[in-house]
């Protein structure tokens, strides 16, 4: 006897990409609903997910709260494509017998995006493209990366890749993180420091690669940002909430 078809709901597919993936074929025979926007309103989410048997979360934009889960009596599975689950109330899922599955994710895309942002900012690429389109030419000088210091805060899979990119560009790499991060960085031949202040004051480019949890939420404060060089670049391709609320506004104003 074959299993009954499920209703699978996939939110936050902004690029209308999932239907073109090879793995989407595995949902053949099931009813699939894909939403191409992101909403936060509880009533709207409850309506969209009301008869879902499974949610497939391809991003971490939609918060799966206890209040929402109580409105979803049919839901039995939440599948998250990446490893982050800070947006899912795991305890509420456990109470309601909802299984949560997470994927391994890939460090390659976020690492490459991080480096693209570093290059764009240090070489003023967006500004120069805009100027060129308006008839201008080389309106400012870029900043060379070779010989400058790349600070890596968190040496997991993504941080390790970004550190390697920095090395390839001739940068001095300085890693900060927990003991496990420091040991891995040392084994890979990178300098490391357990001193947060040294990282902040030394880095010309500081890249954050931390998981978001209770311990790391708001970890980077306005005081931390105030210790950085006025010419330094902060890159955060991890989670916005790693930085204390309003810190990015307060630090420049404080000088």
Residue ranges and their predicted role:
Residues 20-27, 70, 88-95, 180-188:
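Short loop/helix-cap segments at secondary-structure boundaries that form the rim of catalytic
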Residues 50-53, 63-68, 179-255:
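Rossmann-like adenosine-cofactor binding region
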Residues 128-161, 170:
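Glycine-rich NAD(P)-binding loop of Rossmann-like domains
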Residues 51-129, 133, 142-143:
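Phosphate/diphosphate ligand-binding glycine-rich loop within oxidoreductases
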Residues 13-16, 37-40, 59-63, 82-85, ...:
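Short beta->alpha connector loops
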Residues 5, 75, 146-149, 222, ...:
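Phosphate-coordination loops involved in phosphoryl transfer and adenosine-cofactor binding
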Residues 17, 38-45, 61-66, 87, ...:
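Structural motif corresponding to alpha-helix initiation and N-cap regions
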Residues 1-54, 58-59, 170:
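N-terminal glycine-/charge-rich "phosphate-binding" loop or analogous flexible N-terminal tail
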């Amino acid at each position: 006897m074959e299993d009954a078809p499920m209703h699978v709901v996939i939110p936050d597919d902004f690029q209308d990409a999932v239907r073109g993936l090879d793995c989407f074929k595995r949902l053949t025979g099931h009813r699939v609903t894909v939403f191409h926007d992101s909403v936060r309103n509880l009533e709207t989410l409850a309506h969209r997910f009301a008869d879902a048997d499974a949610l497939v979360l391809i991003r971490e934009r939609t918060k799966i709260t206890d209040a929402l889960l109580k409105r979803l009596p049919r839901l039995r599975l939440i599948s998250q494509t990446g490893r982050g689950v800070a947006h899912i109330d795991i305890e509420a899922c456990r109470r309601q017998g909802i299984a949560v599955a997470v994927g391994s994710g890939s460090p390659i895309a976020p690492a490459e995006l991080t480096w693209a942002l570093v290059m764009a900012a240090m070489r003023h690429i967006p500004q120069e493209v805009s100027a060129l389109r308006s008839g201008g030419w080389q309106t400012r000088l870029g900043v060379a990366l070779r010989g400058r210091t790349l600070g890596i805060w968190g040496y997991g899979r993504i941080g390790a890749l970004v550190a390697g990119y920095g090395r390839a560009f001739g940068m001095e790499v300085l890693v900060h993180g927990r003991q496990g991060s420091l040991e891995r960085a040392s084994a890979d031949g990178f300098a490391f420091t357990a001193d947060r202040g040294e990282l902040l004051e030394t880095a010309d480019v500081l890249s954050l690669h931390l998981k978001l949890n209770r311990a790391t939420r708001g970890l980077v404060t306005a005081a931390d940002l105030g210790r950085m060089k006025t010419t330094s670049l902060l890159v955060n391709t991890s989670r916005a909430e790693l930085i204390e609320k309003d810190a990015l506004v307060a630090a420049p104003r404080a000088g």
